[in-house]
Amino acid sequence: MSSAGVLTCIPDSGPIFRETSLRPPVPGQETNNFKPEKFTMDSQHLKHKEDFNREAEGCVAHDSRFSRWGRSLNLLLDDQDGATLFRMYLEGEGLGDLLTFWFACNGFRAMDPLEPKTSKTAKAIYRWYVQNSSAVSGRLKPTTRTQVKECVKNHQLNKTVFDQAQQEIQRAMEQEAFTSFLQSDICKEYARGVEDSPTPESPGPGLPTLTEDEEFGGLHHFSSGMGKINRAFSRIPPRNQRSHFRKLEQTYQYFAPAASINDSEISSDALTEDSMSMTDGSVDGIPPYRSKKQREIHRSVSANGKVSLPFVPRTMRPPAEMMPTSPAEFAAKLTIALEKVKKQRDAEEKLEEKLQRLKEEEEIADYDIPSSSHETVPGAALEDDPQSILDDHVSRVLKTPANLSPRSQSPFVQRKGKFQPAFSKGQTSTSCHLRPKVPQGMEATSTLASELRSSVSSQLPRSSRKPEGCTQPHRPEEGTSAAVLTTPLSPEQEAERNHSVLQWVLDSAKLMKKHHRETASVTPCPELKKATHRAASQPAHLFLQDTSMPPLTAPNTLDQLEEARRRLVEDKRVPKLHKSRCVQSTTLKEKGKTAESVPSSGFSTLKLSEEQKTAKKPSSECPGQGLAIVYYFCGERIPYMIRTKEPSLTLQEFKELLSKKGSNKYYFKKESHEFECNAVFQEVSEEDAVLPLFEEKIICKVERAC
């Protein structure tokens, strides 16, 4: 076969082969007499080909998809849009579980039966759809449900476990929902939107032709055409509409060359910066820096074009609270708000008044009950009170079994309205003095009672307060407890109290007359012991003997607990051995210097003699007792006192003795002749510094550091 024959048989039809062009010869028949026949097609075939070419170019027929959907349910579910629309339709009808179960069966069929997830998936499908879904279980046959249940329960799993159930559900969907879906509004709206949407490759209508020397009259037709386009755009989704709108804008744009603009300005004698002078190197009126600036703009847009800016609406609606209302509604709302504010302020004022009242009551209570009630009281003084001292005195002086007042066996506590002084340390010796003669009559009895009271009050410690009838409180001296301030009694209460005391004294005087005993000399100590023993044999409570004498009030439990706690703290602070030695030495001295033994109360009936005052020394001056340390903690009125065997202390050793630790400042009292008081408080901050002494004691003020 020669190539020349092939070339002669193929006509020169150009680079494109068309159906109307001559066909090449059959291979092997190139040398035969060949008559080229022109291939002709009928009009119907040509029309079909034209439709085919139009579809190949992008104009796809819109009804082809719906025709496929209408053939079978499987074709509908194979299409993504069709499955989505069908799911929406079933969910609207309350049958969404049917389609979900159908897809779950497809997914289970694709799984491997040997995998561990397969059994879990089968159980989940059975539990969620076959067992609990009424839409699925109601359309399955009982035998099918039983078969699936046994397979899942016995772990007889294979790919065909749910095939029978899937076929029954598919048959139910075809009979109940498939036909109605094709005729539903959802399907029709989707078809209408696809038909009305133009293809992406379709060009715009373009500008109408304007003939010269004629007036344009086709504006109406052009506007009607644009109306159709706008209506078509309204049915297109926003994404497609945005893309088509950009293409239409590009179609309608018209660019005039810069040269023609420049020529028109020159011909019209319009002088601008570009047309006035061309010596700056610009071409056609475009400045040379314009291109560089344009490139920079494009770079910035490409770099920052995806920055999301906040959406700011053009119109901002005011909130509902800002909307204008009628004066009546506004007045009602304002009244309610003001009433709430007024109630709140009234409640705050009442609360402030209550707090102020409580504060005043606390201040009054602090004034009535000072902190001196917690002062250390010796053990001997805790067993007696002024009334017991008076009873002992009368029994010794009158030598009669007088009716005794009740004695307080509890620790000393402070009671309002009762005569109870606070006792101090250092006075433990007593002596016997001459007894006065007993007067006659009521006036003499009252005189005797007043003398007894004055004698008892003179022998009490300096720290004891006066009876409640006095107006001026007793000032405590150095080394004694503070005075206890109480409110005075009313005149009726004072008169009743005096009457009870006088009646009791008269009864004692009558008993004395019956015994006919003379009182002329000083009673020796053995006789005093007998008298006290005889007095102690009487009942402790006066109301058992004399109903006219009112009983004492019960002691306060809180005060007793506070005193016990304070004593425990003091016992822990001071070494027990040192304390016992000091007490023992004091008792030995008193026994050696006093010829008469004293009762356990430790108080005398009359004034101490000058010899005993000089012979007895305070317990603080006993030799070998150590150094006394007195300190005030953070502004407290009552000081704390501890003792140590060391002759001197440093600041570090002093801090170890304190029960309260923390960041504090320490000021120690020392002698100084720079001031009139000859004393000054000096701050000591160094740990190794030796503490100064004042009157053979260490006196310190402990303050909180700021």
Swiss-Prot record:
For region Disordered, the annotated ranges are 278-298, 400-482, 585-605
Identify the Pfam families for this entry: Axin_b-cat_bind (PF08833), DIX (PF00778), RGS (PF00615)
Record SMART domains:
DAX (SM00021), RGS (SM00315)
The segment(s) forming the RGS domain are: 72-191
Q: What is its main location?
A: cytoplasm
MF terms from GO for this chain are:
beta-catenin binding; I-SMAD binding; molecular adaptor activity; protein kinase binding; ubiquitin protein ligase binding
List the biased-composition ranges (Polar residues).
402-412
Q: Which domain of life is it from?
A: Eukaryota
Where does the record say this protein resides? Cytoplasm; Cytoplasmic vesicle
Biased region (Low complexity) positions are 453-462
UniProt keyword list: Cytoplasm, Cytoplasmic vesicle, Developmental protein, Wnt signaling pathway
UniProt cross-references to InterPro entries, sorted A to Z:
Axin-like, Axin_b-cat-bd, DIX, DIX_dom_sf, RGS, RGS_sf, RGS_subdom1/3, RGS_subdomain_2
Which segments constitute the DIX domain?
624-706
Sorted alphabetically, the Gene Ontology BP terms of this entry are: cell development; negative regulation of canonical Wnt signaling pathway; positive regulation of proteasomal ubiquitin-dependent protein catabolic process; regulation of centromeric sister chromatid cohesion; regulation of Wnt signaling pathway; Wnt signaling pathway
User: For this UniProt entry, what's an example GO CC term?
Assistant: cytoplasmic vesicle
The protein's role, per its UniProt record: Regulates the wnt signaling pathway by interacting with dvl2/dsh, which displaces gsk3b from the axnr-gsk3b complex and thus prevents degradation of ctnnb1/beta-catenin.
> What subunit structure does UniProt give?
Interacts with dvl2/dsh via DIX domains in both proteins. Forms a complex with ctnnb1/beta-catenin and gsk3b. Also forms heterodimers with mouse Axin1.
What PANTHER family would the database entry show? AXIN, AXIN-RELATED PROTEIN
For this entry, the protein name equals: Axin-related protein
At the highest ranks, the source species' classification is: Eukaryota, Metazoa, Chordata, Craniata, Vertebrata
